[in-house]
Amino acid sequence: MNILSLSECVDRLRKNLVIAYPTESVLGLGCNPESIDAVKVLLKLKKRKLNKGFILVASHFNQIRSYISESKLSIYHKKILYSSWPDTITYLLPAKSFVPDWLTGRSNFLGIRISAHNGINKLCSAFGKAIISTSANISGRNPCRTYEEFLKQFGTTVPILCGPLGTRKNPSKILNIINGSLIRHG
């Protein structure tokens, strides 16, 4: 297994490379959301198409401000966000017009989660911004819940920030903040 320290993982993110890391429920794959080159590597690893979009995780709200159109959020929406984060809930928020299609999946929304997971918070804080977060699995397979499962699917090609997984059994719930629709059960 290719295990890296926090600072080594941050260095890889800054170099627009992909890393693996523990999340609230499964191992995740992540990269710099502003690098199409990093996103292409991530898509190739997962054998996934570009049109699905991605979730961004962050350690605090300021790390995602540049991506979302706050003017489209009412005071009520903001109260929901501020009262429910940090947590395992991912919200689809109105994206600013310049946010790339590879993040939004060609929609007007972007999946955002302010995580309560200590490892994610340390990673995003050290990187200084949000990162892409997607489950560590090849498309169509189950997400990796152990480092052994990760090695079976990806070998040693992707370095890992080791740490404890959260205690959640399922990936995050996804809700559209504007209309309240449930996109994915958590």
UniProtKB/Swiss-Prot annotation:
Domain annotation YrdC-like: ranges: 3-186
**Entry's EC annotation:** 2.7.7.87
Q: What class of enzyme is it?
A: transferase
What keywords were assigned to this record?
ATP-binding, Cytoplasm, Nucleotide-binding, Nucleotidyltransferase, Transferase, tRNA processing
Q: Which residues form a coiled coil?
A: none
Query: One biological-process term from Gene Ontology?
Result: regulation of translational fidelity
Protein's cellular compartments: Cytoplasm
InterPro entries in the record, alphabetically?
DHBP_synth_RibB-like_a/b_dom, Sua5-like_dom, TC-AMP_synthase, TC-AMP_synthase_SUA5
The terms describing its cellular component in GO are: cytoplasm
Q: What function does this protein fulfil? A: Required for the formation of a threonylcarbamoyl group on adenosine at position 37 (t(6)A37) in tRNAs that read codons beginning with adenine. Catalyzes the conversion of L-threonine, HCO(3)(-)/CO(2) and ATP to give threonylcarbamoyl-AMP (TC-AMP) as the acyladenylate intermediate, with the release of diphosphate.
* Family the entry assigns: Belongs to the SUA5 family. TsaC subfamily.
Against PANTHER family, the record matches this protein to: SUA5, THREONYLCARBAMOYL-AMP SYNTHASE
This chain belongs to the protein called: Threonylcarbamoyl-AMP synthase
Specify the species: Buchnera aphidicola subsp. Baizongia pistaciae (strain Bp)
Gene it is expressed from: tsaC
